A protein has these predicted regions:
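Aromatic-residue detector
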Residues: 15, 22-27, 57-61, 93-100, ...
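Hydrophobic transmembrane alpha-helices
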Residues: 1-72, 76
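Hydrophobic alpha-helical transmembrane segments
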Residues: 44-52, 90-103, 131-136
Length: 184
């Protein structure tokens, strides 16, 4: 892989991490596709297309809000990856939606699994620390596991971008035009 692609993957990791950290300070909503698309456009040198793709994906993910224990599709991953590949391949916003929805669903599935295993372990560690009266350790574990969770998801996005470039390009070329332009 080229050095330029690696640098873009690192920058997209940072964009995704910023998006995932929206819930760390309360729900700031800066993980929404419009914000993520704009930041991806800034990183890749095409802010206008980033805003257009982000706006389109915002409509697609309009109702994707976690309520209670529900975990909607991961719009951060969907927006970052779809915007990046749309900008790099020169595809249109219809193709961005075609890429974003399955990516968002797959990353949400991964997130559910890692929450079941990794964050459950962190919860047990917090329980033990609380039982021993070590509240500083509870806070430390909670912060590290929360930030680690977000970093893991951002890493997944960056790796998906870095290693998935050729796969996404093949997918974009394979998808029939009526699928990507179905809502025109």
């Amino acid at each position: 892989m080229t050095e330029g692609l690696f640098l873009k993957a690192v920058l997209l990791f940072l964009v995704a991490f910023v998006g995932y950290m929206h819930s760390y300070w309360g729900s700031t909503m800066h993980n929404r596709p419009l914000i993520m698309g704009t930041l991806v456009g800034l990183v890749l040198g095409d802010v206008k297309t980033g805003i257009i793709i982000g706006s389109t994906l915002e409509l697609a993910f309009l109702g994707a809000v976690p309520i209670g224990a529900s975990n909607p599709p991961d719009m951060t991953a969907g927006a970052v990856i779809a915007t990046a590949f749309t900008i790099l391949t020169g595809a249109d916003s219809g193709m961005a939606v075609t890429i974003a929805i399955p990516v968002a669903a797959l990353v949400a599935l991964f997130d559910n699994f890692q929450m079941m295993f990794l964050l459950t372990q962190a919860g047990h560690m917090c329980d033990k620390a609380a039982a021993n009266g070590d509240y500083r350790k509870v806070e430390k574990i909670a912060r590290i596991s929360s930030i680690g969770n977000k970093a893991l998801l951002a890493l997944l996005v960056a790796l998906g971008f870095y290693f998935g470039s050729s796969a996404i390009e093949t997918f974009v070329n394979w998808v029939p035009e009526w699928v990507s332009h179905g809502m025109d």
